[in-house]
Amino acid sequence: MPQRHHQGHKRTPKQLALIIKRCLPMVLTGSGMLCTTANAEEYYFDPIMLETTKSGMQTTDLSRFSKKYAQLPGTYQVDIWLNKKKVSQKKITFTANAEQLLQPQFTVEQLRELGIKVDEIPALAEKDDDSVINSLEQIIPGTAAEFDFNHQQLNLSIPQIALYRDARGYVSPSRWDDGIPTLFTNYSFTGSDNRYRQGNRSQRQYLNMQNGANFGPWRLRNYSTWTRNDQTSSWNTISSYLQRDIKALKSQLLLGESATSGSIFSSYTFTGVQLASDDNMLPNSQRGFAPTVRGIANSSAIVTIRQNGYVIYQSNVSAGAFEINDLYPSSNSGDLEVTIEESDGTQRRFIQPYSSLPMMQRPGHLKYSATAGRYRADANSDSKEPEFAEATAIYGLNNTFTLYGGLLGSEDYYALGIGIGGTLGALGALSMDINRADTQFDNQHSFHGYQWRTQYIKDIPETNTNIAVSYYRYTNDGYFSFNEANTRNWDYNSRQKSEIQFNISQTIFDGVSLYASGSQQDYWGNNDKNRNISVGVSGQQWGVGYSLNYQYSRYTDQNNDRALSLNLSIPLERWLPRSRVSYQMTSQKDRPTQHEMRLDGSLLDDGRLSYSLEQSLDDDNNHNSSLNASYRSPYGTFSAGYSYGNDSSQYNYGVTGGVVIHPHGVTLSQYLGNAFALIDANGASGVRIQNYPGIATDPFGYAVVPYLTTYQENRLSVDTTQLPDNVDLEQTTQFVVPNRGAMVAARFNANIGYRVLVTVSDRNGKPLPFGALASNDDTGQQSIVDEGGILYLSGISSKSQSWTVRWGNQADQQCQFAFSTPDSEPTTSVLQGTAQCH
């Protein structure tokens, strides 16, 4: 009688036979499908039950499958879990040990990618990266490897002493992928045709192109635009540069036209060379600022860290001193409550003060940039273009303070900046810096001056209040930024004296928040002041969103302006899926009040088609109506619209997308991000990618996933619920880690053709033995004969395919047959046929 691994309700013989027929071929072929019942029970069957066939032929030896996790050796696509944490997914080769259980083979390079201290283990350090390790347990004592075949999951347990301790979110630089060679262009084209009641007509077009070429780690980029109206048309090159990453420095090297970061001095454009650190190359948990938490555990303990009442970190630590440097703070301020729970249950607590400003760095982390070249003037400005050099650095001194500063110099301009930022504990975070600049203009007038800057930030979790204030003060009218210093014909009589900016937000109760923001600038030599103030309230209740906003502005060369707006947004899911209706009222000084009604929504299974209808009317009876739609396809996004009002009508149109030239051909795509992926489905068309609406492989089997996160693991999965009927995939998920600007390749091996249940008989017309292994002589695809001599095959076409069937090692225990589908179009997704094996 069959035996169950787990207790459960009893099955009838008929039910058991059905389970055998459906599940065993799946397990034996390595499909990775779990053979379970509705109650998720796993069954074990004694092979003795299966040793007799209808034909009386000797069956295949299935004794190896009587042991848990025992399967056929080979290469499997598996999820790798290391110490109960998923670390990657890749193809691993398995061999059978003396107990017929599968054990994994690793190369030394793969062990290095897993974070094993290869160079510190003598038995591994002396081997090349391509060397194969058959038994990891013999090299690293205490290691265990278990292959969960049903879930295609390889569980590794490796002592912590043999592993590097990596920060959360860490991805080994050995996995950073430069990508494959490519040429591409990103384009955005828009146009409009305006017709006026008087009979006039105007047309405009605009084309934005971001072009690129990748070869190895190098990235060549060009940004150009084209504009056209009724009178003129023009091409403009915005910038061109060559860039690559420097992994050892976690930095980017750039040659060409770009702009400085503006972290210390005001940003400006240049032509030259720049080397700057890239925080994207750091693990997620080490970006930005967070303090290093240190303490001492008296035993094996659990350390829990809370911020604003939420647990943001929890980990097991050994007895003795510990250090935690990979926190993800939940907000910019809010002290950290650290709890140490010892093995006997006793607890100790202490408070780690915490507040942060944007420039603050973690203890010991250096962020820098070094730039040299020629200042690059704006296209329409009258400016000189001197040679210059700039260097900036920001260094995390400790848990409290960050130091920063910079130098900038050219023939007629010198600037020095220095500052310090720090946490004030419960009082928030504060930074103060001072810049001195010496400037000489073409008319030999010389100036020098100082700029003081103070920034303050504070979160008050008890009241859900956020406060941010910045104050700039210029000691005299002689301070000029580098942009201002290079501008000819400068108005020296309008020099800024000070500026204050503030932003306050307050959550008053769940779903409702208030905000206030504003700024004021005043100037030397006059009493003029520019002011801008905004206040508002917003919230959401029962799915209905609302906001009320007021803005006041005053500028020296303009009249005071006041504006009030009210917005309501109501979901229509009950009547019209994925749609909302909204109302907006806008009242502005000296202008008629305007009312607008709008309907927005999306259609098709993944929202690829979006639409909007809008009607507006003001108090002077001016009206405007519009209809717009856009469609997001694998080859780009297409949009069109029409609007008309009292005096005019307008047609508008546009298309955005990308064109990618790669080693296998040309693929059209949606608009590309910084890094992207080329999907290769081995010629299968219509294969969709999860979480990327509109993305599907083209008739050649290629698609482009337009945006990925650089230096982090990205999961690319096929939407198996919408696979074409003639496509089977060997694996449905790939993980990629692209470098900045890279196009990485993700290949999904597809069997293209039809699914067939073929009854195979021997030369005497008798069914082949149950459990015999059938292999495709060309593709290597495998299947298992069931108890009726039936094989499940996929990827079958009208072209004849040769298969070899084996049920032993003797010459009379194997045969061959050929099979193909009819030339006519099949009417079902799973065909049936017969074949004779010789």
Curated annotation (Swiss-Prot):
Give the main location: membrane
User: Is Disulfide bond there in the keyword field?
Assistant: yes
User: What is an example of a GO molecular function annotated in this UniProt entry?
Assistant: fimbrial usher porin activity
Question: What domain of life?
Answer: Bacteria
Induction section of the entry: Expression is negatively regulated by H-NS and subjected to cAMP receptor protein (CRP)-mediated catabolite repression.
Which membrane topology describes this protein?
Multi-pass membrane protein
Question: What biological processes does GO assign it?
Answer: DNA damage response; pilus assembly
Subcellular location as annotated: Cell outer membrane
Consequence of gene disruption? Deletion of the operon under classical laboratory conditions does not result in any major effect on E.coli capacity to form biofilms compared with the wild-type strain.
Query: What is one GO cellular-component annotation here?
Result: cell outer membrane
Pfam families, per database record: PapC_C, PapC_N, Usher
Q: Where is the signal peptide?
A: 1-40
- Keywords recorded for this protein, A-Z: Cell outer membrane, Disulfide bond, Fimbrium biogenesis, Membrane, Signal, Transmembrane, Transmembrane beta strand, Transport
Record-annotated disulphide pairs? 815-837
Entry keyword annotation includes Lyase = no
Stored SUPFAM superfamilies: FimD N-terminal domain-like (SSF141729)
**Coiled coil segments of this chain:** none
Please report which protein family the annotation says this sequence is part of. Answer: Belongs to the fimbrial export usher family.
User: Any additional notes?
Assistant: The operon is cryptic under classical laboratory conditions, but is functional when constitutively expressed.
Functionally, this protein is described as follows:
Part of the yraHIJK fimbrial operon. Could contribute to adhesion to various surfaces in specific environmental niches. Increases adhesion to eukaryotic T24 bladder epithelial cells in the absence of fim operon. Probably involved in the export and assembly of fimbrial subunits across the outer membrane.
Q: What is this protein called?
A: Outer membrane usher protein YraJ
The scientific name of the source species is: Escherichia coli (strain K12)
The lineage is: Bacteria, Pseudomonadati, Pseudomonadota, Gammaproteobacteria, Enterobacterales
